[in-house]
């Protein structure tokens, strides 16, 4: 099995606590509201903390598909959230799982700095393709911007 790491960092004008609330605390309800392709997020097993399995149902290419996410860490104090895609349509055939480690911290002018590490755990010595990496980054960036936009459009949130 190979492990391939990718890191990304972005900034937001939204304070870490408000952004974390949208990205983590309320995400199961907010994401289907702000991302048209995502129909639902439901807990299949667990209570929302580490070890919880969530089913994310989405439409891609006119077909309804799903991903299974396993929550690895929820740290509300330090604004950190880690999870892995462990099954479903979001995993390429050459990948066992994709893990995401995210952390928000205070940024300039009351905003946030978001750091993300993505780890592809591949089968054998396969490497993720550039297309898979670019597609995953685009989806992640879109999700982040959609939730950030929701918070900005709803000042009382």
UniProtKB/Swiss-Prot annotation:
GO molecular function terms listed in the Swiss-Prot or TrEMBL record: abscisic acid binding; protein phosphatase inhibitor activity; signaling receptor activity
Q: Name a GO CC annotation attached to this entry.
A: cytoplasm
UniProt-listed PROSITE patterns? PATHOGENESIS_BETVI
Q: A Pfam family for this UniProt protein?
A: Bet_v_1
Task: Kindly summarize what the UniProt induction comment says about this protein's expression.
Answer: Not induced during nodulation. Up-regulated upon pathogen infection.
Q: Tell me the GO BP annotations in alphabetical order.
A: abscisic acid-activated signaling pathway; defense response
Record keywords: Pathogenesis-related protein, Plant defense
Give the tissue specificity. Answer: Expressed in roots. Detected in nodules and leaves, but not in stems and flowers.
Annotated family: Belongs to the BetVI family.
What is the designated name of this protein? Answer: Class-10 pathogenesis-related protein 1
Organism, per UniProt?
A: Medicago truncatula
Phylogenetic lineage: Eukaryota, Viridiplantae, Streptophyta, Embryophyta, Tracheophyta
